[in-house]
Swiss-Prot record:
Residues 1-21 are annotated as: Disordered. The lineage of its organism: Eukaryota, Viridiplantae, Streptophyta, Embryophyta, Tracheophyta. It holds the Pfam family FBA_3. InterPro entries: F-box-assoc_dom_typ3 (IPR013187), F-box-assoc_interact_dom (IPR017451), F-box-like_dom_sf (IPR036047), F-box_dom (IPR001810). This is F-box protein At2g40910. Residues 63-113 form the F-box domain. PANTHER family: BNAA05G37150D PROTEIN-RELATED, F-BOX ASSOCIATED DOMAIN-CONTAINING PROTEIN.
Length: 449
């Protein structure tokens, strides 16, 4: 009996020694310096010798073994954590919350080369009854031949129309209001409605589009709104533009236009956000297509008419099928109007925005890939991937949801399946939109308005 008690006592002492050698949970305390605390929170940085029992140390003795982690090193350590973990760790202390929430730290996430970045696709589904869902898709294969819905990130009741994004922030419209959503922090903002100066009369069409961009000079996120009102065939065009700075006390402010300004109707598709510049397609009339650029910093609007070459026939707005893409760092109009009938694509590249010069390039689909383009499925441009492939998606959902990726360099068209979409969305007509995340970054900033 005594021997058994002695064995139990030795086992308990051994277990206590092992527990003392285990690294303690790190935290920060409310001080001017970033420090790591011990499990009781009594001292900075519990880097004590493993053989020295913590309970036998006085506060003065433990401080003798304390050392400080430099703030820049601590920031480097935190930056290697997943974004979702950063959000959870904000509750450790006020100092951690201040570090992770500060603008400098958030901006460093977009320039860090040590962070593991994974491209993904955001997809919105909206039915006629107003039911919505926001899905997040990621690739399951190295060659990106299949994207699967992450069920843990699926949000019912989230999402809307005309999805676009910048630096990890999603922008979409719900009932003519702009909504901002941060998938990392799960924060959602609904901005107030705009009191427009132009009113749509009976039988007139009203188009409202929201775009989000980032001002790198003032480090501000801004929302741009274009409102266009027109009669049939884009006659009697009127348009105006508004800006909202995402900061405390922000409000809609009307943009002043120059005398050379062209009223226009924003296109349903055809938008591209290059961080500090927003580009979108528009129509000046039924036969004149243009690209409108809005500089987020200077808040200047520029209208660039897509000029035709000799022998080209202008397509009316109702027939032209095109979208904006990025082509070797330049803005381009990807015109796939004749893709299904003639298996060709016209690419209009903006060579000089200041001089408004365009360059045309024609691409012809390989004969062995013509079966990927069906006559009964209408396609729409959904942007470009990080490696320059154009994303084409069906306008309407089908039982086998997919996208087409077109490599303009090798003239190769590939089909990419999308799996995991709830079956209930295939049994009804719904609005379907998706955006490929070009910057691959996540933002942990908390937005205030």
């Amino acid at each position: 009996m005594k021997r058994r008690r002695r064995d139990l006592k030795q086992a308990a002492e051994s277990e206590q020694e092992e527990c003392q050698s285990v690294p303690q949970v790190v935290s920060l305390r409310d001080s001017d310096q970033l420090q790591i605390m011990d499990e009781k929170g009594d001292n900075s940085l519990a880097l004590l010798p493993a053989k020295l029992p913590m309970r036998m140390c006085s506060t003065r003795e433990r401080r003798k073994y304390t050392c400080e982690i430099p703030p820049d090193l601590l920031m480097e350590i935190v930056m290697r954590l997943p974004a979702k973990s950063m959000v959870r760790f904000k509750c450790i202390s006020k100092q951690w919350s201040s570090l992770i929430s500060c603008r400098y730290f958030c901006n460093s996430l977009f320039t860090s080369v040590t962070r593991k970045k994974q491209p993904h696709i955001h997809m919105c589904l909206v039915d006629h009854g107003g039911q919505r869902v926001l899905l997040s898709l990621s690739s399951t294969s190295p060659d990106n031949t299949c994207y699967v819905v992450d069920q843990d990130l699926s949000l019912t009741g989230m999402g809307g129309f005309f999805l676009n994004l910048v630096r990890g922030l999603l922008c979409f419209s719900v009932r003519e209001k702009a909504c901002i959503y941060n998938p990392t922090t799960r924060q959602r903002l609904t901005l107030p409605a705009i009191k427009s100066d132009i009113i749509a009369l009976k039988d007139e069409r009203k188009d409202i589009r929201y775009y989000i961009g980032h001002d790198p000079v003032n480090d501000q996120y801004k929302l741009v709104c274009t409102i266009g009102i027109s009669s049939a065939f884009f006659t009697n065009l009127k348009s105006e533009h508004w800006v909202f700075v995402l900061e405390a006390g922000g409000s809609w402010r009307k943009v002043r236009t120059l005398e050379s300004y062209h009223p226009h109707a924003p296109s349903t598709v055809g938008q591209f956000i290059n961080g500090s510049v927003v580009y979108y397609m528009a129509w000046l009339d039924m036969d004149t297509c243009a690209v409108v650029s809005f500089d987020i910093t200077s808040e200047e609007l520029t209208t660039i008419i897509v000029t035709l070459e000799a022998g080209d026939v202008a397509l009316p707005a109702g027939r032209m099928k095109a979208g904006l893409i990025q082509y070797h760092g330049e803005i381009a109009v990807f015109d796939h109007t004749h893709l299904k009938e003639k298996f060709l694509v016209d690419l209009w590249v903006l060579k000089d925005a200041g001089m408004k010069k365009w360059s045309k390039k024609r691409l012809v689909l390989q004969p062995c890939q013509k079966h990927l383009v069906h006559d009964d499925i209408e396609l729409v441009v959904k942007g470009t991937t990080q490696d320059g492939k154009v994303i084409l998606a069906p306008v309407n959902m089908c039982s086998q949801l997919y996208i087409l990726c077109y490599d303009m360099g090798s003239n190769d068209l590939r089909k990419v399946e999308i799996k995991g979409v709830p079956d209930i969305w295939f049994d009804k007509e719904c609005y379907f939109d998706l955006k490929y995340s070009l910057d691959e970054s996540e933002d942990v900033i908390y937005l205030e308005t």
